[in-house]
């Protein structure tokens, strides 16, 4: 049996059906999905928890506390939710890089 995790990131030009991959070893299966908005994130969560038995979800720092609560509700009480947040300096560096890439 493998530990199954889903990583979701907000990306302005993402299409969740197109932008994803699966990485896998004998003991670990990581699903990666890029989503444009919260509605796509919720759909991905519901679909993969049901179809793949996801046990843990990792979210990019762009998810708000409200978003995280909605994702927890969609995933169910038996799925762990983690948000990948950096310290102040790291967040600033990432924001500048995203700005240069044209995210906003």
Show the residue positions of the predicted features:
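N-terminal basic/disordered segments at the start of proteins
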Residues: 1-17
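Structural preference for beta-strand elements that scaffold enzyme active sites
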Residues: 4-6, 56, 78-82
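Glycine-rich phosphate-binding "P-loop"
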Residues: 23-39
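Amphipathic, hydrophobic secondary-structure cores in small proteins
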Residues: 45-46, 51-63
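A polyampholytic, Gly/Pro-enriched intrinsically disordered region
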Residues: 54, 100-104
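Short, ordered loop/turn segments at secondary-structure junctions
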Residues: 62-63, 86-89
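Alpha-helix-loop-beta-strand connector modules within alpha/beta enzyme cores
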Residues: 68-86
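Short, charged, surface-exposed secondary-structure boundary motifs
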Residues: 89-96
């Amino acid at each position: 049996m493998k530990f199954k995790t889903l990583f979701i990131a907000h990306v302005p030009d993402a299409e969740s059906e197109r932008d994803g991959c699966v990485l896998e070893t004998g003991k670990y299966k990581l699903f990666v999905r890029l989503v444009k908005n919260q509605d796509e994130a919720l759909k991905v969560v519901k679909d993969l928890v049901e179809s793949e038995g996801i046990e843990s979800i990792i979210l990019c720092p762009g998810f708000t506390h409200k978003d995280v609560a909605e994702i927890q509700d969609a995933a169910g009480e038996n799925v762990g939710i983690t948000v990948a947040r950096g310290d102040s300096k790291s967040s600033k560096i990432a924001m500048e890089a995203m700005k240069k890439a044209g995210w906003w």
